Amino acid sequence: MNLVVAEGGNKTQRDIAEKVVDFMIGQLLPRHRTLDIEIQLKNLNDENAVGYCMMEENNRQFTIEVDRKLGIKELVTTICHEMIHVKQYARKEMDDWSGKGLARWKGKTFNAEKTDYYNLPWEKEAYRLQDKFANLVWKEEII
């Protein structure tokens, strides 16, 4: 059984985060039963990002950090975006090599530090799909 836990933020944010992550698992990774996802709602104080996804020890354990100052709509969209990255790691579409700036996307190596963020293929996919899934969250009345 998948484990999804939200920490930080307020109770409403934690409830929304857990429901959206559970929904996204069903949409993107319906056959996965051993995912361990922790959502940390915190002050990111980062001008360039409102969320991050990190694979932990293996491609079943993840930490998602989301800026707790986001409004509900942006919170949902950001979690959908980061869950697309979870899918990419879990399905081994993406693998990054910590500290070297290199990442592999579907077998091809990219230097993430030398490629424009919005031109990275995993980001292109996440941005392309985030609104589709955020709209589904609202349409399906997940929250």
Regions found by a protein language model. Name each.
Residues 1-57, 72:
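Auxiliary, metal-adjacent structural segments of Zn-dependent hydrolase domains
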Residues 13-17, 76, 118, 122-125:
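Hydrophobic (often cysteine-bearing) scaffold residues that line and stabilize catalytic clefts
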Residues 2, 27-34, 93-95, 136-143:
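Surface-exposed helix-capping loop/turn segments at secondary-structure junctions
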Residues 77-89, 126:
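Active-site recognition of the HExxH zinc-binding catalytic motif
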Residues 116-121, 125-143:
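Long, well-structured alpha-helical subdomains associated
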Residues 54-59, 103-105:
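Short alpha-helical hairpin
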Residues 62-79:
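Short pre-active-site segment immediately N-terminal to the catalytic Zn-binding motif
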Residues 73, 89-123:
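Post-HEXXH active-site segment of zinc metalloproteases
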